[in-house]
Every structure is written in C-alpha cells, then in structure tokens.
Amino acid sequence: MRKYCILAVFCCLSYLAAAQSPVEKGLESINRTSAEAYIGFLAHDELQGREAGYHGSKVAAQYIASLLQAMGIQPLGDSYFQPFEAYRRERQKRGRLEVHPDSITIFKKEVHQKLSMTNVLGIIPGKNTSEYAIVGAHLDHLGIDPALEDDQIYNGADDNASGVSAVLQIARAFIASGKQPERNIIFAFWNGEEKGLLGSRYFVQTCSFISQIKGYLNFDMIGRNNKPQQPMHVVYFYTEANPAFGKWLKEDIKKYNLRLEPDYRPWDNPIGGSDNGSFAKAGVPIIWYHTDGHPDYHQPSDHTDKLNWEKIVEITKASFLNAWNLANEKEY
C-alpha cells in the first residue's frame, strides 16, 4: 500500500510540474537566496566599491560573466565583455569623462586621463533574430574615499548591486522557462554609469541594431523603502507613448498575486536618471524600476543589512514578466 501511495504522490508532482506554463517555471526560479548571494558578493568590502576603471569593477564583471556562462547564456559577441575607454580632457579632477568609439584618436593631444572599462553582455537568441529586447543595470559604484575617517568603502548594495541581482535572476528565469523567446533578449551590465552613463552610452553609440530594439528594461536601486508606511512601494517609469507597459504591470500584479504597490509614472521623454536615458535618446522605449532615494544614497552606509529583500524579489518577479512581454508580445 505504501508503494502505491508514494507512486501516486510522485505522479501528482510530475503532473503539476508538467502543467506549469513556461512563465510560471521562470517565476518559480526567482528567490531571495539568489538575491542575497549576488548582492552579498557585489557589495562586499573586497570589491572596494566597484569603481569603474578600477579593480573592484573588473572583479564584478568577471563574476557576472561567470554566472551567465554557468546559466547557459551565450555571449553577445565573441566574448561576454565589451571593452571601451573613457577620457577626461580637463586637467582638473572634476573634469567630465567622455566616451566615444574613437575618443582617444580624436582627442589624443587633449587627453589628461584615460580609464579602461568593460560592459558585460549576454544573449538568448530569439526565433525572430531581427528584433531585440534588452534588460540592464549598471554594475559600478563609487569606490573608496581614503579621506573618510571610518568606513571608506562605498559598497553600493542598493546602488546598484540590487539592480544587477534582478538582471541575473531574470536571465536565469528565461532559461528555466524552457521556451525560446520570440525576440533576441540581451542581458546587459553597464560600467561607468556613476561617471556619466558611460557604458550604456558607448553601447548605444556602437550598436548596429539600435533601430531593431523594441524596448529596454532598466534597474537602478530597487531595494530600499523611502516610504516606511508602504514597504512594497516602487516607482515604475515608462515611455508614455507605450501605454502597454503600464497595462502589463497592472495585469500581471493581479494575475500572479504580486504584492507590489507601483507608483506609475509615464514619461514623455525619459532621457534622465539612469542608463534608460542613453536608450531613450536613441528613440528606444524604456521601463525603469526604482525605489527612490534614501539617506544612504551615495554614502558608505549603503549596506546589505538595510535592504528590503522581499521587495527585491517581488520587483524581480514583476520585471521578469515585463521582460517576457518585451521578448514575446507581437505588438506594443
């Protein structure tokens, strides 16, 4: 009798697993344990604040690439890495860094500082190889300030290890779904955002298929509570000309019982704030998840113990559904 009971339970579980839709399989793979692991590594003191062009951000890039490879995500090109250089023409330290495919050649006589950086780019090829969706977040932060007396490391747990964790989990969720998307979907990790959106700007400047990108989904700071009375509050920016982006989230929250409380902010010209600006300026529709500022913004006190893990997981699930729509919906 016991054998029959065990067999019945096994058959039932097998049926339930088989009955799950690809989207549900992807959602099920998103969890707090992974968020804690990814953010914990990226925001560790050993990464020295992940300043673009320096050791910590290079370690972060290698870590992210190794995870993409382990998941089975292909590199976008011959490598997961897209190297680029930024330059500063002014002699003063405060001079703005610039990026251009031929920047050093063009401004060679005027360059007084050069930084070498790397974006990390992976792709799941779609059935329709002529269209793209991109999911991205910046991997860099502010590094170290030796002038500070106590904590000198800007760990950047919320800004933006939290966003990187979401992109990684979404990439894994697409693999877990077991279904090839209709469009190519790129998973992008930008370097140099804190120095002027350098990595995303370089990508857009050099992208041969920019007009074929149907949408860009951005994450920048998704782990804190700026409204204690609303712990699941999140700001949801999206291109106003694409009302489907707002409709999707409203429908998905209801359908999948997500506990987010979005502040919907359609934006007629979303060219500021984060890496979404690089794409919006090129005419690409955008979505941007953001949980607003807080007292630890751009401070050494931006640590993992202050994150709302439940919110990070819920945002990641909601945004996976956004990405699924970007990659699979015929029209929007």
Language model features by range: what are they?
Residues 1-22:
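Bacterial Sec-dependent N-terminal signal peptides
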Residues 176, 293-332:
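His/Asp/Glu-rich mid-to-C-terminal helical/loop segments that flank catalytic regions of hydrolases
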Residues 120-122, 131, 135-141, 145-196, ...:
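Alpha-helical metal-binding/catalytic segments enriched in His/Glu/Asp
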Residues 50-123:
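A non-catalytic alpha/beta surface segment that caps or lines the substrate-entry region
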Residues 22-29, 45-55, 70, 106-111, ...:
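Second-shell loop/turn segments in exported
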Residues 39-43, 82, 119-121, 132-136, ...:
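Structural recognition of the beta-strand scaffold that forms the well-ordered cores
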Residues 190-291:
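Metal-dependent peptidase/peptidase-like ectodomains
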Residues 22-24, 29-59, 71-81, 85, ...:
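N-terminal capping segment at the start of a domain
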